[in-house]
Amino acid sequence: MERNVTLIGLFAALIVALGFVPAIPLGFGVPITLQSLGVMLAGAVLGSWRGALAVLLVQALVAIGLPVLAGGRGGLGIFVGPTAGFLIGWLPAAFVTGLIVERLRRVPVALAAGIGATLGGIIIMYALGILGFWLVKNAGLKPEDAPISLWAATAIMAPFIPGDLVKVVVTGLVARTIAQYRPSALLARG
């Protein structure tokens, strides 16, 4: 139990620390950050529930106003901004990534982590992120936000996919390295 709490806190800290790497703004409210890599790693290494709890801890820190997101952002307003869908999507992304690594025990861990990170960290996170971005842009909260189609919201997010595919590869390599040198630390397979 104590080990689980420690690792959940450690991965929450990793996600926060990755927010200190400067974000790359693209001009439409959703920056490129490394924090989604931390989400993928939390699921792949800790497993479904522990990975999701690490993400939930970070989301709680954001909600109470701590500036733990890339660019020093935090507060409840983040949950109604253009990145809200992605931030909300972190929870199921970590859970699904971990669940896939747990279930694909006969598959090499790097491949299982890559499949999990692709399904959880890209497909699920993007589905929620695009939907959230589209809803915010069509809510008319800001005068400069002209309504956009769901297809346009999807096209706007396309530049993020290559970078996230690199994060998938990194997740697989890190999971394989942990499995090779410290297998007891790969809780998703424990």
Curated annotation (Swiss-Prot):
Q: Does the keyword Nucleotide-binding apply?
A: no
Q: Where are the transmembrane segments?
A: 8-28, 29-49, 51-71, 76-96, 115-135, 146-166
The record ties this protein, via Pfam families, to: BioY
Gene3D superfamilies linked to this entry: 1.10.1760.20
What GO cellular component entries does it have?
plasma membrane
Keywords noted in UniProt? Cell inner membrane, Cell membrane, Membrane, Transmembrane, Transmembrane helix, Transport
Q: Give compartment(s).
A: Cell inner membrane
Record flagged with keyword Iron: no
Its placement in the membrane is given as:
Multi-pass membrane protein
S-S bonds:
none
Primary localization: membrane
* Any one Gene Ontology molecular-function term assigned to this protein's record: identical protein binding
- Subunit details: Part of a biotin transporter holocomplex composed of BioM, BioN and BioY. BioMN complexes can also be readily purified, but not BioMY nor BioNY complexes. BioY homodimers are also seen. Only the BioMNY complex has ATPase activity.
Quote the PANTHER family the UniProt record gives.
BIOTIN TRANSPORTER BIOY, BIOTIN TRANSPORTER BIOY-RELATED
Report the family membership: Belongs to the BioY family.
Q: What does this protein do?
A: Central protein that confers the ability to take up biotin on E.coli; while biotin transport requires BioM at very low (pM) concentrations at higher (nM) concentrations expression of BioY alone suffices for uptake.
Name this protein carries in UniProt:
Biotin transporter BioY
Which organism is the protein's source?
Answer: Rhodobacter capsulatus (strain ATCC BAA-309 / NBRC 16581 / SB1003)
Q: Gene encoding it?
A: bioY
